[in-house]
């Protein structure tokens, strides 16, 4: 039985195994996003100064580690070479799989460090965030880079992304299961739950990467034997020019001239900000806009569905991408976000059912857009390769440079959101505890009753004006992005030509 199961796993399509890696990230990361702030604020009682110091250091490290790890991984690919040099090979894929097989289990172990008090809350908060983000960055960089390395055509990349969304949706079920064990007064059951999740993630990373490595090691060995003979003939007959090594400064200069990259990161910075704004303030909106109008189970359902629906919705968006292209779908989602926000603003905060739909759909469509943008980055990888005639696509490095510019949006979201709320209403999350009862209606103190109308109005304005502003700025940036239509087809054709460019040289020899 065990051998038959292993045989079935070995014959799974590459896209399925690649997509399954998203499952082993999402089962942990969704739980982390939902509970880490509440754990340190409500359970470990971190003070306000330590919290902001930790977030500030995390902002810096979170922005720098993506390009740093990307540069360390892909700097050897930046050298230029004569036309006809091979662009993609099993060795590149194997390098990324080895990185995933090492960093995946370490990522799962770092996840466990949050749920046991082992140091001063401020120190533990800082160390846990930086350690967790480091391993998550390594996993994300190489997993995303494989999307560009395993396929070139939009159809194949869409298929890979489809399975990522499918498995991410399954991984989001961990959020629903966590409700059964989450108890700030008794952490034992939640800790056991997290240990089980981490163990599943470790086993999954190990098994999936091993299956993919076996598959590409077989292909790589055959290809290596063939290339060794061809290189000997090539060296005997022709002199090969020395490769030109690209320094970091030269690479940054190349990126600064990459017009589509610049417009994309401007748009994506706003998108990352909006995604994390929704995640950070979703519980607050539920508490102060809906808690006295909906039941606890309804609030929990809205919170849970907001985590799983983006992945399921993305399966439909990907089918639209196959038909209309990623650019058109993303532009349509920006217009949809703007239209829904304007309708909600005109309707006002007293339309309960419309408010429920808007709060949930705002997060679902925003997260869905984020998940499509990896396809755009892979197109930028192709354009970067063609424009700069690289011998190999520096996929992880370009994903890292995108993150360098856009990841500050993760930290700006809670900072700007809490600042706007405090300026408008005088509400301070460190003096009150809005997360102590996210979706339930408890008896309010007299001071709370006085503050509630202003706080409710402030939450509503944040809810509608942030997406309106984001949508307008994103549409402005996205209209300047030209890597779609005929230009994208031309870039794809040139990269395919480079990949097949060795064949004419062999015939000449």
Curated annotation (Swiss-Prot):
Ranges in the topological domain labelled Extracellular: 1-10, 74-98, 150-153, 222-259, 321-325, 389-397, 478-509
Cystine crosslinks: none
Parts of the chain on the Cytoplasmic side: 43-54, 117-124, 178-189, 288-300, 346-353, 425-458
CC terms in the record's Gene Ontology section: plasma membrane
Main location as per UniProt: membrane
Leader sequence residues: none
Membrane-related topology note: Multi-pass membrane protein
Top-level taxon in the UniProt lineage: Eukaryota
SUPFAM superfamilies in the cross-refs: MFS general substrate transporter
Compartments in which it is found: Cell membrane
Membrane spanning residue stretches: 11-42, 55-73, 99-116, 125-149, 154-177, 190-221, 260-287, 301-320, 326-345, 354-388, 398-424, 459-477
Keywords on record: Cell membrane, Membrane, Transmembrane, Transmembrane helix
PANTHER family named in the record: TRANSMEMBRANE PROTEIN 180
Protein known as: Transmembrane protein 180
């Amino acid at each position: 039985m065990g051998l038959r199961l292993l045989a079935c796993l070995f014959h799974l399509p590459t896209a399925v195994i690649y997509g399954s890696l998203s499952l082993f990230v999402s089962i942990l990361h969704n739980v982390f996003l939902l509970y880490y702030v509440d754990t340190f604020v409500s359970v470990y009682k971190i003070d306000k100064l330590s919290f902001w110091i930790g977030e500030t250091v995390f902002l810096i490290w979170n922005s720098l580690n993506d390009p740093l790890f990307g540069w360390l991984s892909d700097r050897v690919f930046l050298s230029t070479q004569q036309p006809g040099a091979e662009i993609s090979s099993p060795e590149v894929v194997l390098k990324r799989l080895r990185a995933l097989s090492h960093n995946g289990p370490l990522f799962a172990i770092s996840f466990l460090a949050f749920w046991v008090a082992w140091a001063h809350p401020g120190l533990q908060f800082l160390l846990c965030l930086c350690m967790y983000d480091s391993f998550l960055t390594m996993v994300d960089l190489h997993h995303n880079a494989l999307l560009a390395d395993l396929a070139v055509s939009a159809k194949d990349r869409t298929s890979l992304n489809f399975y990522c969304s499918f498995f991410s949706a399954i991984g989001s079920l961990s959020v629903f299961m966590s409700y059964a064990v989450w108890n700030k007064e008794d952490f034992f059951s939640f800790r056991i739950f997290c240990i089980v999740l981490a163990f599943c993630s470790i086993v999954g990373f190990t098994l999936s990467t091993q299956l993919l490595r076996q598959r590409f090691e077989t292909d790589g060995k055959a290809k290596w034997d063939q290339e060794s003979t061809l290189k000997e003939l090539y060296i005997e007959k022709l002199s090969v020019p020395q490769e030109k090594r690209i320094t970091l400064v030269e690479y940054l200069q190349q990126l600064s001239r990459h017009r589509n990259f610049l417009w994309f990161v401007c748009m994506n910075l706003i998108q990352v900000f909006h995604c994390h704004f929704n995640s950070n303030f979703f519980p607050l909106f539920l508490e102060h806009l809906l808690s006295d109008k909906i039941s606890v189970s309804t609030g929990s359902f809205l919170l849970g569905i907001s985590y799983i629906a983006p992945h399921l919705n993305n399966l439909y968006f990907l089918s639209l991408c196959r038909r209309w292209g990623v650019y058109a779908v993303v532009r349509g989602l920006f217009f949809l976000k703007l239209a829904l926000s304007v309708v909600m603003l005109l309707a006002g905060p007293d339309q309960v059912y419309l408010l429920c739909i808007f709060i949930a759909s705002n997060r679902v469509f925003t997260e869905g857009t984020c998940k499509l943008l990896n396809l755009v980055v892979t197109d930028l990888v192709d354009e970067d390769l063609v424009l700069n005639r690289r011998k190999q696509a520096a996929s992880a490095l370009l994903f890292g440079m995108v993150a360098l510019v856009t990841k500050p949006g993760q930290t700006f979201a809670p900072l700007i959101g809490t600042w706007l709320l405090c300026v408008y209403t005088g509400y301070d999350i460190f003096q009150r505890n809005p997360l102590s009862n996210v979706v339930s209606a408890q008896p309010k103190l007299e001071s709370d009753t006085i503050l509630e109308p202003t706080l409710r109005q402030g939450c509503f304005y944040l809810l509608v004006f942030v997406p309106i502003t984001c949508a307008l700025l994103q549409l402005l940036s996205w209209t300047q992005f030209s890597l779609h239509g005929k230009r994208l087809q031309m870039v794809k054709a040139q990269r395919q030509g480079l990949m097949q460019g060795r064949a004419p040289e062999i015939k000449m020899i």
